[in-house]
Design a protein with these regions (language model features):
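Conserved N-terminal subdomain of the carbohydrate kinase-like
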Residues: 48-132
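Glycine-rich phosphate/adenosyl-contacting loop at the front of the ribokinase-like
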Residues: 1-73, 110-116
């Protein structure tokens, strides 16, 4: 099946060992986001997946694209521009404390996408399914 996914890649920062965001100095970083996660899962199941998004033309943006390609995604339709990747900070639940997520997405590369920047006819050519959320 040929799938097109459209959405923002996010850079997730999380603490280790059930620490709160305010505790300790170290964080782990991973690329993700709902559409990126769905796209990778679909690719791992053997589908041909085109990932449509926007990334900053920085070392971090290039690292993100490389990781998406390593996971089997076609990144041909990623736009380049904007100042940064949207981020979120994740605090794992512990004991009676619930998980917590803090988003920082304003002025991300994806936030700066505008009509006409994506060649949708080319994106959807031959596609069977479209996923976005």
């Amino acid at each position: 099946m040929k799938v097109v996914t459209f959405g923002e890649v996010l850079l997730r920062f999380s603490k280790r060992d059930d620490y709160r965001l305010t505790q300790g100095a170290q964080m782990e970083a991973h690329f993700g986001g709902s559409e990126a996660n769905a796209a990778v899962s679909l690719a791992m199941l053997g589908n041909e997946v085109r990932y449509v998004s926007c990334l900053p033309e920085t070392a971090m943006g290039k690292a993100c694209e490389q990781r998406l390609r390593e996971m089997g995604l076609n990144t041909r339709f990623i736009n380049w521009g904007g100042p940064r990747i949207g981020t979120y900070f994740f605090e794992q639940a512990a004991s009676l404390r619930p998980s917590r997520v803090v988003y920082d997405r304003k002025d991300s590369a994806f936030y700066n996408l505008h009509p006409g920047m994506i060649p949708w006819r080319d994106v959807f050519r031959g596609a069977d399914v479209f996923h976005c959320s």
